[in-house]
């Protein structure tokens, strides 16, 4: 198997309920449009000159391996609010960037603030110039079924 550096990426987030916590996670992936692929978990570096998409490419093959940075949380505790957030920091000149993720028992605004701080610190410790921060998040309050919140950056080789 050979890997190539991704050329395109998209930020996604969703929350969903399900019959089990795993089904809730799967349902959130389906809501995002990535429930029928295999997510290959990555760490946090964005390749230089990546193109950011506004919508998923059409006809992604079932079972395709897609490099992905993601965070998720599931709960079956009625009344609890859970959130997942993912933030990207883009450098001057699109020479690369960083992705940070957070999920927890909190409102999405708290999760968003956490990833914003992480992006800023990641750039600071590297001595990189931060041009822009983008954040996606999802929040759900558990009712009578298990729930999940998921946030992801999915990368594509084409």
From Swiss-Prot:
Q: What name has this protein been given in UniProt?
A: Pyruvoyl-dependent arginine decarboxylase
Write down the NCBIfam families for this protein, in alphabetical order: pyruvoyl-dependent arginine decarboxylase
Q: Which PANTHER family match?
A: PYRUVOYL-DEPENDENT ARGININE DECARBOXYLASE
Q: Which gene encodes it?
A: pdaD
Q: Where is this site: Cleavage (non-hydrolytic)?
A: 43-44
Alphabetized GO MF terms: arginine decarboxylase activity
Q: Alphabetically list the UniProt keywords.
A: Decarboxylase, Lyase, Pyruvate
Q: Does the keyword Lyase apply?
A: yes
UniProt-listed HAMAP family? PvlArgDC
The free-text note explaining how the cofactor binds reads:
Binds 1 pyruvoyl group covalently per subunit.
Reaction equation(s) it catalyzes: L-arginine + H(+) = agmatine + CO2
Q: Which GO terms describe its biological process?
A: arginine catabolic process
């Amino acid at each position: 198997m050979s890997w190539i550096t991704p050329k395109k990426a998209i930020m996604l987030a969703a929350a969903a309920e399900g019959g089990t916590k795993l089904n809730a996670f799967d349902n959130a992936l389906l809501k995002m449009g990535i429930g029928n692929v295999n997510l290959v978990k990555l760490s946090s570096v964005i390749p230089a000159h990546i193109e950011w998409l506004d919508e998923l490419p059409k006809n992604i093959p079932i079972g395709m391996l897609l490099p992905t940075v993601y965070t998720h949380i599931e709960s079956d505790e009625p009344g609890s609010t859970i959130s997942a957030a993912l933030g990207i920091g883009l450098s001057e000149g699109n020479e690369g960037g960083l992705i940070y993720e957070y999920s927890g028992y909190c409102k999405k605004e708290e999760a968003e603030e956490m990833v914003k701080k992480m992006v800023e610190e990641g750039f600071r410790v590297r001595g990189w110039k931060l041009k822009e921060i983008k954040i996606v998040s999802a929040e759900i309050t558990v009712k009578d079924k298990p729930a999940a919140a998921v946030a992801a950056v999915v990368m594509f080789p084409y």
